[in-house]
Every structure is written in C-alpha cells, then in structure tokens.
Amino acid sequence: MEGGTGRCLCGNVRYTFQGVPNWQAHCHCESCRRVTASPFTSYLGVSHGSWRWTGATPATFASSPGVRRHFCPSCGSPMAYEGDRWAHEIHFFAATLDDPAAFRPTAHVNWNEHLPWVRLADGLPVRYTPRRLTGDEDMGPFLNLIREAFAYMDGIVDPPSSVHALTGAALAEAARAGEVWVIDELSAPLACMVLTPKPGRLYIGKLAVAAGHHRKGLARQLLAHAAIRAKALGLPVLEMQSRVELTGNHAAFEAMGFVRAGETAHPGYDRPTSVTFRRPVP
C-alpha cells in the first residue's frame, strides 16, 4: 500500500496520507479491544507530515496519560490513535480505509493480551509486550522456567550452572534490586531475563525460553527490550556471558549482533570458563 484515504461511517471525518506506511499490524491489547468493542484491532502507522484530515476535525478522548484516541463526533467511529511513545506518527484504524483490502499486516502485536478464543491461522509472527516483575509475585513459575531452560547444560558445563543454587527468594530480590522481565501468555511464562545495571553497561542474565517456544523470536524480543531499558538508564552497552562449552549459544549471540569481549574464570579454575559478549546500544 502506498498512500490512501479513509473515512468514518457517516463520512464526516476523512483523512488522506502519502507514501508507504511505517508499519501495518494487528493489535491485541485490552485498551484497543475495548475502544473498538472487537477481539483485536488493525492499525497502520503514518509519519506526521505525511497525512492530514480532509473532512471535519475528529473529537479526541484521552484514554490514558499520553494517549489520544480520535473518533467521529457524529457517528462515533474510532479513527486513529496517537501516543507519546510514538510521537513521530499517527496510527489509523485499517478498517477506516476506503480500500481496506489494500492493508497488508506483517505481525500480531501485544499477543500476550490476546483473547483465548481467538484462533488465527494467518502465519504472521506474534510480538509480545514484556512485563516487569515487582518481586511480590509468586516466583515459582519463573524459577521453573529458568531451571528447565538451563537443564540441558548439566553434564556439559564445568563448573555446574549457578541455576542450581537459584531460589525464588533470590529471583524476587533480583526483581527488586535490578529488573526481571517476562513474556507470558494467558498467565503462562514463555520467556524471561534478569537485567543488572553495571558501570557503563547493562548485564543480561538468566535469558530463558520455555520448551516448545524456541525459534519464535522471543529471545530477540527480550533483547530488543533490554536495549530500550539500557537507553533509558543511560547505559551504552549490553553485556551477556556464556560458558565456554556452549558454542551454540556463542553463535546465537553473534547472530544477534553481540561480539566477544573477553573471557573469565570461575574461582578455583586456571582456565577460562565463561565468554563475555557485548553489543552497543543503538
């Protein structure tokens, strides 16, 4: 789709835009569902300066701090979304397009909030919104996720993984002292990571993905969120470590833009036991 026009039900509010949309996707977040009374919504993002209202000016509702939702004051049709998080663009509802068949979604976003009775077979990738743990939740499910994800290391790495000594209380403390982020779906944890700010860098530990959910981009989504957090904290580098024996992990980290930055040894060992990887924050 390159350029287009759209309107509300009664035709009072209209818009036009030029160029290819920045993105096109389906959103499953609760607030978008409620504002449209639909199981999910579909949007296209258009940069400011590339669009304009051509009919009546829509009414605006501030649904939450920093969020403005535009709708027709005559027929009530939802028209568009604007938010401080996306200050450079407006999001038009795809169903308001005069030619909605031209819409070409590329992903489902906020999938962790999707309704359990929504079954879609379009093959599009799903994107989740990571959730930060406060430390007051039951850490059992997240601890089990980490233990199960790291279990394959048993008998491979020397010394044994520190996961064996990890407790729910320690994970809760990590959430309070640092940051623990999870991706879950219908209350079931799918992936998690622990972020620890260090001088000049943000350390990523306990990156884990649940069995049956590999190769779905969950680790990449968490690492992308880690970059967002690093930027917010003023830290220019992401850092991870992997045991020297786990060459598959090394290749995976390098494929995601990390480079080897050094080696370290556990206490009592006269050889390197871990490899440090780093990636600059864009």
Predicted segments — roles?
Residues 32, 207-209, 242:
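Hydrophobic adenine-recognition pocket in adenosine-nucleotide-binding enzymes
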Residues 83, 239-242, 254, 259-275:
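Conserved catalytic-core motifs of GNAT/GCN5-like acyltransferases
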